[in-house]
Regions:
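Multi-pass membrane proteins that catalyze or facilitate reactions on polyprenyl-/lipid-phosphate substrates
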Residues: 1-268
């Protein structure tokens, strides 16, 4: 039987690898729970959300200098203030819909069938967008027009369906609205900070009864593993997509979703 520590390490790796790639971390965690006996029980369902904080802090660590400069200039620099407003505007749709319909979404959509279909459809869309002859005109994620930030925020709401991918929805929307691949990916990172912190705080409060000091060590393991893994993945990801695009991730989604459907059809 798998030890809790090993389970925490595996889930931390899955979270760190998939959170910022356009492949759906939630979808992969749900499939891992279903097919590999990982994450059963209320605690492990909450654990999957709690270790996202490690991935969030990886983004803060990578972009610390830029984020600190923006924080210091927010009240004196119009450009910095506008970017902060843009991130908040993009975050707002998901916050409202998540608060209003989060329970319904988890009750009816968090199942492996939905995940597999979402992975395949999302992969096909990502592949299509990546092959389009787009003419980008936005090369800096901190200077998008405010309506563009809002549109990306609405697109991110689709990621409440497990398997869609928060970063994938944000990246596709940004590219269709004129961002180049690197800027689209970077804004998905910035938008992840308030979005994932909100999900973390909400889930921590909602499931506080399942959290005890007995779980502190397991959560710490998953947190550290997701943090380290996410740092490695984000740095590699930006360099890769700038040169090669998103085709690899699109096909990964399609393959994982297809294999998942086959396994489900066979009664797994």
């Amino acid at each position: 039987m798998m030890s809790d520590a090993l389970r925490a390490v595996i889930l931390g790796i899955v979270e760190g690898v998939t959170e910022f790639l356009p492949v759906s971390s939630t979808g992969h965690l749900l499939l891992a729970e279903r097919f590999f006996d990982l994450g059963e029980g209320n605690f492990w369902k909450s654990f999957a959300v709690l270790i996202q904080l490690g991935a969030i802090l990886a983004i803060v660590a990578i972009y610390f200098v830029k984020l600190w400069r923006i924080a210091l200039g927010m009240f004196s620099n119009p450009g910095d203030r506008r970017f902060v407003i843009g991130v908040l505007v993009a975050f707002l749709p998901a916050a409202v819909i998540g608060a209003a319909a989060g329970g319904y979404i988890k009750a009816y959509l968090f199942n492996p069938w939905v995940v597999c279909f979402s992975l395949i459809v999302g992969g096909a869309i990502l592949l299509w967008v990546d092959q389009l002859d787009l003419k980008p005109h936005e090369y800096d994620a901190t200077t998008f027009p405010l309506p563009m930030y809002l549109a990306i925020g609405f697109a991110q709401c689709l990621a409440m369906i497990p398997g869609v991918s928060r970063s994938g929805a944000s990246i596709v929307a940004a590219m269709l609205l004129g961002a180049d691949k690197r800027a689209a990916a970077e804004f998905s990172f910035f938008l992840a900070i308030p979005t994932m912190i909100g999900a973390f705080v909400y889930d921590l409060y909602k499931n506080r009864a399942d959290m005890t000091t007995d779980h502190a060590g397991i959560i710490a393991i998953g947190f550290v593993v997701s943090f380290v893994t996410a740092i490695i993945v984000v740095k590699t990801f930006l360099s890769y997509v700038t040169r090669h695009g998103f085709t690899l991730f699109a096909w990964w989604r399609v393959i994982v979703g297809t294999l998942g459907l086959i396994a489900l059809a066979m009664g797994r």
